[in-house]
Amino acid sequence: MTLQRERAHRPEDLTRLFVERANEGDAEGMALLYEVDAIMAYPLGQQTVGRANITGLFEKMVASRPHFGLEEPLPTLILGDLALTSTPALDVAGARAQVARRQPDGTWLRVLDRPDFRG
């Protein structure tokens, strides 16, 4: 049976869906919020490239069962099929920023993600 997951119909949905899936321990679902060739600037000072590698990163992350709080988004900037989303971080990261792209079906996926501005 295929698991049906909610999709992001607005760029702002991505943060909420990420937090919900992280708190459920759904690493695969978290990674499905990213394009296949997405780049994440994490761990600090490194880049994780591609959804497969991002999935592996999230599997390690959720193994420790962290709890993520929902951060209040800053206003989203949209230009055509690109959107810049950002939130002030509830932890020591300072801020978070992502670039999302509208998909052909009208949903949104992350292309670039910088979840931590410390390094």
Go through the PLM ranges and name each one:
Residues V36:
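Short glycine-dipeptide loop
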Residues M1-G29, I39-G119:
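A beta-strand edge to alpha-helix "cap/lid" segment located at domain peripheries
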